[in-house]
């Protein structure tokens, strides 16, 4: 659509609209704002924690305890309930502020032409048809079509993923092009880095690209897998308890036993079958795990997502600022030879190497390239926050950093002064300066697109000086430029010539007869730790998918360098032509996506999830936020990430280090391993208690354990070792295993078989000791004490043997988990206290044990 057609469609012109029209349109379109969602109050968040099924089961256990008259234990259980709720509340209190962060990105004011006059108004009052003026440093207040432009460049990395400032033009473009290629448009929330323009507002508020992203982020997040599995486990356990309790009640009642005895037995069964410590131990494992992650720069914002991270099968990662440094770096120079430049980012440390040998910056061809790069340049490098930053254009900054690496930047600047400048623009495609240089006179320096710079050159550089530039030379140079571009390098050609102070200063004269100096290739380089992180991920069975707004060639080259994918790249326009079914069919075959929008990222994540993957999505820009929300776990970068992305995420990487993600995955696996161990341990004890009571009653024996005794084991004695299991250190093989099946139940079938086997052994031992003691000693309380202590010690043995589900505990370092050892000691003391402290003997109806009974137990 042409500019005239846009103006006509919006019923506007180059002078904008009138104030009257603006009022009418404001009432029609609404304010230029993003919606503010209703946020739950802190009280509602806290109350919501009590709706968890396992918490409801605990509350039921407390009620049962009150009925049984065990008020102390009931209060203990309620205390656990409140503690679990508080921990969950604290973790989630500040969650989901993404919409608020998005609103903060919108410019508060805008310069607009109304009634033919320039005025400044609140950005919220902008309407379609308004003509706005934008200049360097401005935040774009709404989406708009450019009417007039002067050397305009816009930073769109947070919206599109494009790592470089984008040059904008006032021209007609095809309609079916990617968001990142719409160079005649400016978009809300992006920043003008250079030049100025006049643009007509085409969309405001939720109608903008940023507004559409805001809409994408409204989708409900699925429940974390761990939470779902624990709810399913709680339901199964509650059903089992009710069925067995009912059977025992009916069995005892049918035998003519008093109703109160049958009720007490049923209560004991209900208490036995509920692993009261499980929600607390799960929350504790998650909480301590998040603390360990925080020490490694991975900040978890939602506790259950730790388990999700540990079961990740695919990491979808943005390129710019995540896999790469986000800092343009000069990587290669081509004069009559190829020169490699080492180092990365804006840190001015590195070397210049040709054919394996280090070059000195005094060598003529290299020195000339560096001088031109500094002269034809308006950017600077400065110290910032313990590092370095570029002030100005990142591409120019890369040339400045290269001169700093050579140690000649200050010398070049101090020995020269700017005389004339012909700036870069979209039509010229080059920048030319004339500098007065000490001992050299006046020097013309030019940088720009290779084909453009070559058209102004008549000579080229050789090892022996200069020579006439031939057509064969031109073809060779352009072939070199194409080769560099194929390797994801942003290519600039550099040229120069000396002039005298008597030469004409007209631009045509200045920019003719130049000497071609060489080509420079810059790129946003991969972070040095990323290749190893990806290698470890592969070893752990985790696939890495790169999703970027950058160009196909850049994406392919970065993917090849990092070992991502097989060289195949799908672009956003191809995704637009693919149905959801087609995308799901091909999603496992492609690992690199280029020129994508926020909607594309969400589609990719959803396609992977539809194939059964657990998806982690990393990113730092606004364009990543909807996909982070859609993923099973969203991972934001802490330093370079926008507030929008951080608030949409489940985890924030504080150091922007991709390797930290791998470390977090390892920690997530450790945490889930420990939750599995703790679950197996606690369930084996609960099953053993259930079965011991059931079989004793079924065989006609009195209750072997009282409800108070069971509660003491469940809430106190078994909880200390369980805390130790929750803190078991990571084992060496944890990142050599394939990811868990996301559909695996909690506990899994093999783990349940193992758990039932342990429970059977405990039942046989406990019930056997009880029956033997009861037959030799008519004191029922004494026999129950033997059963209580026996069960307690079986619990201790079980805790220690549960340290690993993969290898024998006897092959492990016996002192490898000191917390568990202290927990076991505390558990033994808690058991002995009930047996030997007089007032506790009264409460729990226990008796001191003889040496014969201790021999039987041990």
Mark where each language-model region is.
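Conserved cytosolic headpiece of P-type ATPases
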Residues: 1-738, 746-747, 771, 788, ...
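Generic alpha-helical transmembrane segments
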Residues: 717, 761-763, 785-799
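Membrane-water interface at loop-to-transmembrane-helix junctions
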Residues: 739-761, 780-786
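Long hydrophobic segments that form regular secondary structure
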Residues: 766, 770-780
């Amino acid at each position: 659509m042409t500019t005239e057609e846009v103006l006509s469609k919006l019923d506007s012109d180059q002078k904008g609209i009138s104030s009257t029209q603006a009022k009418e349109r404001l009432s029609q379109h609404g304010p230029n704002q993003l919606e503010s969602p209703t946020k739950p109050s802190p009280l509602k968040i806290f109350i919501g924690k009590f709706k968890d099924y396992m918490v409801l089961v605990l509350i039921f256990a407390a009620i049962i305890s009150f009925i049984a008259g065990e008020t102390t234990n009931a209060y203990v259980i309620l205390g656990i309930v409140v503690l679990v709720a508080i921990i969950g509340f604290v973790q989630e209190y500040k969650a989901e502020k993404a919409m608020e962060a998005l609103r903060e990105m919108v410019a508060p004011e805008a310069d607009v032409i109304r009634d033919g006059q320039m005025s400044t108004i609140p950005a919220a009052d902008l309407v379609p048809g308004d003509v706005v003026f934008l200049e360097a440093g401005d935040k774009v207040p709404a989406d708009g079509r450019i009417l007039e432009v002067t050397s305009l460049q816009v930073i769109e990395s947070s919206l599109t993923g494009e790592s470089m400032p984008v040059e904008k033009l006032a021209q007609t473009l095809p309609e079916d092009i990617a968001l990142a290629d719409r160079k005649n448009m400016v978009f809300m929330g992006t920043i003008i880095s250079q030049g100025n323009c006049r643009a007509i507002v085409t969309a405001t508020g939720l109608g903008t690209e940023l507004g559409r992203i805001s809409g994408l982020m409204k989708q409900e997040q699925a429940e974390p897998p761990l939470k779902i599995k624990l709810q399913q486990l709680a339901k199964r356990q509650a059903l089992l308890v009710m069925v067995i309790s009912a059977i025992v009640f009916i069995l005892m009642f049918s035998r003519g036993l008093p109703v109160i005895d049958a009720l007490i037995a049923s209560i004991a069964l209900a208490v036995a079958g509920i692993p009261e410590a499980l929600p607390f131990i799960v929350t504790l494992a998650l909480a301590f795990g998040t603390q360990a992650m925080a020490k490694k720069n991975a900040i978890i914002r939602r506790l259950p997502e730790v388990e999700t991270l540990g079961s990740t099968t695919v990491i979808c990662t943005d390129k710019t600022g995540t896999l790469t440094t986000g800092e343009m770096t000069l990587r290669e120079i081509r004069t009559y030879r190829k020169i490699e430049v080492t180092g990365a980012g804006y840190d001015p440390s590195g070397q210049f190497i040709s054919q394996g040998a280090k070059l000195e910056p005094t060598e003529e061809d290299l020195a000339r390239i560096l001088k031109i790069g500094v002269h034809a340049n308006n950017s600077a490098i400065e110290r910032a926050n313990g590092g370095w930053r570029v002030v100005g254009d990142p591409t120019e900054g890369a040339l400045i950093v290269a001169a700093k690496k050579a140690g000649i930047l200050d010398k070049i600047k101090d020995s020269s002064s700017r005389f004339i400048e012909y700036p870069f623009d979209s039509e010229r495609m080059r920048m030319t300066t004339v500098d007065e240089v000490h001992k050299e006179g006046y020097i013309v320096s030019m940088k720009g697109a290779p084909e453009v710079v070559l058209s102004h050159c008549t000579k080229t550089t050789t090892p022996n000086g200069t020579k006439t530039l031939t057509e064969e030379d031109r073809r060779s140079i352009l072939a070199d430029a194409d080769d560099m571009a194929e390797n994801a390098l942003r290519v600039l050609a550099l040229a120069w010539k000396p002039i005298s102070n008597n030469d004409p200063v007209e631009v045509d004269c200045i920019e003719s007869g130049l000497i071609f100096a060489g080509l420079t290739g810059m790129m946003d380089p991969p972070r040095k730790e990323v290749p190893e992180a990806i290698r470890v991920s592969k070893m752990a069975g985790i696939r890495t998918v790169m999703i970027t707004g950058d160009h196909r060639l850049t994406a392919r080259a970065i993917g090849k360098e990092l070992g991502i994918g097989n060289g195949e790249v799908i672009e956003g326009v191809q995704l637009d032509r693919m149905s959801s079914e087609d995308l799901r069919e091909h999603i496992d075959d492609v690992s690199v996506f280029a020129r994508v929008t926020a909607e594309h990222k969400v589609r990719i994540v959803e396609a992977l999830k539809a194939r059964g993957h657990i998806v982690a999505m990393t990113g730092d820009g606004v364009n990543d936020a909807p996909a982070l929300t859609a993923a099973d776990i969203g991972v934001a970068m802490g330093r370079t990430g926008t507030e929008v992305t951080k608030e949409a995420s489940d985890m924030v990487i504080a150091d922007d280090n991709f390797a930290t993600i791998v470390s977090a995955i390892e920690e997530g696996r450790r945490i889930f391993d420990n939750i599995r161990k703790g679950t197996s341990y606690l369930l084996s004890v609960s099953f053993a208690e259930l079965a011991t009571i059931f079989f004793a009653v079924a065989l006609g024996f009195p209750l072997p354990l009282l409800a108070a005794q069971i509660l003491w084991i469940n809430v106190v004695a078994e909880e200390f070792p369980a805390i130790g299991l929750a803190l078991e250190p990571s084992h060496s093989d944890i990142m050599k295993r394939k990811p868990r099946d996301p559909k695996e139940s909690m506990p899994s079938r093999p783990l349940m078989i193992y758990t039932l086997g342990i429970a059977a052994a405990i039942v046989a031992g406990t019930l056997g000791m009880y029956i033997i003691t009861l037959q030799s000693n008519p004191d029922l309380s004494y026999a129950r004490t033997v059963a209580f202590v026996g069960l307690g010690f079986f619990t201790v043995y079980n805790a220690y043997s549960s340290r690993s589900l993969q290898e024998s505990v006897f092959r492990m370092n016996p002192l490898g988990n000191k917390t568990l050892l202290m927990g076991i000691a505390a558990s033994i003391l808690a058991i002995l206290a009930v047996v030997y402290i007089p007032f506790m003997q009264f409460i729990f109806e226990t008796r001191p044990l003889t040496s014969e009974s201790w021999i039987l137990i041990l």
